[in-house]
Design a protein with these regions (language model features):
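C-terminal substrate-binding subdomain of Rossmann-fold SDR/epimerase-dehydratase oxidoreductases
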Residues: 1-132
Length: 132
């Protein structure tokens, strides 16, 4: 509490934040879509091995959020301002990333959709219940 947080690229970064319930839902649905031995693999064209079919599937909403907006949601949920240590861009980092959930949606019909305005307060409430 009260410790400064490092904010890289002076907050001029975007990330695709995924709420835990969306992640669990995506994994649960993917488990039901797992290849079964001896049966044709649906969407096998994206599998890297015909012998042991497997996939890398992004689970994210594909909606990048500005880091400063994310921090603002945390501040709002906690009812106090963050102590920010503004830092330059770090070597090897990128200004924006987001998930492409097209394969997830094709396999399961699901795409994560919980906005940070819902997910961040829920996370903060959960944390407070357990650790405050």
């Amino acid at each position: 509490a009260g410790q400064p947080i490092d904010v890289y690229n002076h907050g001029q970064m975007s990330r695709d934040f995924t709420y835990i319930d969306d992640l669990v839902e995506g994994i649960t649905r993917l488990m039901a879509a797992a290849p079964i031995k001896g049966q044709p693999v649906i969407g096998a064209e994206d599998s890297l091995s015909p012998v042991a079919p497997w996939r890398v599937v992004n689970i994210g909403g594909g909606q990048p959020v500005q880091l400063l907006d994310f921090i603002a949601e945390i501040e709002k949920a906690l009812g106090r301002p963050a102590v920010r240590n503004m830092m330059p861009m770090q070597p090897g980092d990128v200004p924006a990333t987001w998930a492409s959930a097209e394969l997830l949606q094709a396999l399961t019909g699901y795409c994560p959709s919980t906005p940070i305005s819902v997910g961040v307060p829920a996370l903060c409430d959960w944390y407070r219940e357990r650790y405050a």
